[in-house]
Design a protein with these regions (language model features):
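Metal-dependent nuclease catalytic cores that hydrolyze phosphodiester bonds in DNA/RNA
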Residues: 1-122
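Metal-dependent nuclease catalytic regions and adjoining charged, substrate-binding loops involved
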Residues: 9, 160-226
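Conserved catalytic cores of phosphodiester-cleaving nucleases, focusing on short active-site segments
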Residues: 53, 112-139, 154
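Short, solvent-exposed loop/turn segments at secondary-structure junctions
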Residues: 99, 136-138, 169-172
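Short, mixed charged/polar active-site loops
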Residues: 107-111, 125-128, 176-183
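Active-site-adjacent loop/helix micro-motif of nuclease/hydrolase catalytic cores
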Residues: 139-146
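An active-site-proximal "capping" alpha-helix that borders the catalytic cofactor pocket
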Residues: 147-158
Length: 226
């Protein structure tokens, strides 16, 4: 049975292409099409560094809970230890998904993994909380994060309106030393979330058809047989 699916990263790429300056259009289009066609992707050193940071946070949390480690007595920067404390007692790498009815196309599945999830009813967050850990060597402002589709899509997985980005800012792009930590707190409007997500998917599908990319999306991105 054919399946339609979409990740918030693809919606972000589409948003970026539509809204970017004309001088960036060619590069933005190429990046969007590469995602649709699942072009081979080699993680950049920055991405690898970020993944390693997330892994270190998870291992520190697990060590504290399983073996009684004292976070603030162990090596690491103050910023790193704050991230660990914020994630303590949360569940790491939790898979979530939700299906939407998109007029003219049928059911479309969204899916992804939360870096850290505090489910509803947890001892530490009664109404639940989702944390996403980010790293960057060049923090400009919060809009890169707050305007992303990730919080809204992920919030709908578990119907949790509280989302937090923890952004570790390196001293520079080549460094592994944290200069500062940004906590970006969001309260999501889940009442309008489904309508917004469905509208965005519909706009994207219209664009795919107008640009002759539906078959690539349907067969390559969604992995439906030809």
């Amino acid at each position: 049975m054919a399946t339609l699916k979409i990740a918030p990263t693809l919606l972000n790429s589409f948003d970026f292409y539509i809204g970017c300056p004309e001088s960036w259009k060619v590069k933005a289009y190429e990046g969007l099409v590469s995602t649709i066609k699942r072009a081979p992707f080699k993680p950049t050193p920055e991405i690898t560094k970020g993944l390693n940071f997330e892994d270190q946070v998870q291992k520190r949390v697990e060590g504290c809970l399983q073996f009684g480690w004292k976070n603030h007595e162990l090596p690491g920067s103050t910023e790193f230890k704050i991230v660990v404390d914020r994630c303590m007692y949360g569940k790491f790498q939790v898979w979530g998904e939700r299906t939407y009815d998109v007029p003219g196309y049928g059911k479309v599945k969204t899916a992804g993994k939360a870096d850290v999830l505090f489910p509803k009813g947890s001892d530490h967050f009664q109404y639940g909380k989702i944390i996403d850990i980010k790293t960057t060597g060049n923090f400009k402002d919060e809009r890169k994060y707050t305007e992303s589709w990730q919080p809204l899509v992920y919030g709908m997985f578990w119907e949790i309106p509280y989302f937090q980005f923890l952004v570790a800012v390196w001293e520079d792009t080549g460094s592994t030393k944290i200069k500062s930590l940004k906590a970006i707190n969001m309260k999501l409007d889940l009442e309008t979330a489904e309508e917004r997500i469905v509208n965005q998917i519909t706009n994207f599908y219209t664009w795919l058809n107008l640009n002759g990319l539906w078959e690539d999306y349907f067969h390559t991105y969604c992995k439906n047989p030809r």
